[in-house]
């Protein structure tokens, strides 16, 4: 519904159940990559052309491999949905020792690493899935920045009733008339005007307006 019909990524033991659902989906195609960094670049390129991209990694080793690409998407205003398949909520709450963790009983270390390079983050539970997932996706679309979704494997296996299908929300137009007037005055007063635009023209799809 947001505009991404392909999902990039690398299989891992904490995301396999979710990947089964992606592969079984009629309208979404799974694109496997050689590593997560490549997947993040592929999702970035897809987003630049189609408006938004999505990728899936596994907890720890997988999501950390994607950090460089997601940081690049943030720097260049490219909306990518980075989904991390994670251990069950029970494992995380009990602080169990599992592979790909730091072995200290904490499971939010990697999620915190995504906070400076994503515009929104969500820890998905059965209770908040229908509100948090639309929230972060709409934030990605509106702010043209990547977002991070932490998806415990037990939540991925839970059937959740969706009463209202997802619909992208359009951010209200801010008052930019004063800026338009300023640019117009400068163009009219210039003898040989040249317009040099930034990458935001691509990010916000403003080619026609320009």
Mark where each language-model region is.
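N-terminal alpha/beta PP-like core and its mobile active-site loop of ThDP/TPP-dependent enzymes
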Residues: 1-210
């Amino acid at each position: 519904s947001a505009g991404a019909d392909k999902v990039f990524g690398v299989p891992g033991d904490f995301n396999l159940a979710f990947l089964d659902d992606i592969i079984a989906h009629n309208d979404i195609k799974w694109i496997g990559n050689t590593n997560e960094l490549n997947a993040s670049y592929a999702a970035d390129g897809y987003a630049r052309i189609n408006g938004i991209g999505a990728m899936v990694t596994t907890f720890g080793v997988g999501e950390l491999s994607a950090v460089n690409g997601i940081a690049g998407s943030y720097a260049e205003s490219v909306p990518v949905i980075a989904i991390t398949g994670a251990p069950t909520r029970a494992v995380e709450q009990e602080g169990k020792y599992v592979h790909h963790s730091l072995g200290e009983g904490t499971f939010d270390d990697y999620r915190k690493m995504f906070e400076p390079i994503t515009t929104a983050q969500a820890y998905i539970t059965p209770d908040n899935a229908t509100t948090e997932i639309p929230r972060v996706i709409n934030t990605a679309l509106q702010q043209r920045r990547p977002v991070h979704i932490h998806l415990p494997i037990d939540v991925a296996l839970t059937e959740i009733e969706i009463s209202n299908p997802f619909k992208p929300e359009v951010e209200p137009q801010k008052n930019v008339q004063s800026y338009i007037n300023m640019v117009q005055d400068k163009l009219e007063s210039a003898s040989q005007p040249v317009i040099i635009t930034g990458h935001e023209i691509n990010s916000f799809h403003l080619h026609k307006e320009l």
